[in-house]
Amino acid sequence: MNFGEAITAIKNGKKAYRQGWNGKNQYVELATRISYVNSSGIIINVKHDASGNNALAFVGTSGVQLGWLASQADMLAEDWDVRED
């Protein structure tokens, strides 16, 4: 599948990955209802649905990278697939 199809699958709650990625169990999914801890240690829940409260999350061997940005190679690749879990 191509990147556009992978993004559609991710927006529909699926986990997508590239067959060409080196690491096993790496995938991208949609993170919603994002919150963070500010410098004072207070948890801030971002509640702005109108402007968006979603981000792509890359889950890999080193943890989660929130706000993942696809490379040009990722965007042009035709080896995207969807995990069934």
Question: Where in the sequence are the language-model features?
Answer:
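Short, compact, well-ordered microdomains
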Residues: N53-D85
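Catalytic phosphate/metal-binding cores of nucleic-acid and nucleotide-processing enzymes, i.e., regions
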Residues: M1-V46, F58, M75
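Extracellular/periplasmic catalytic domains that process cell-envelope and extracellular macromolecules
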Residues: D49-A50
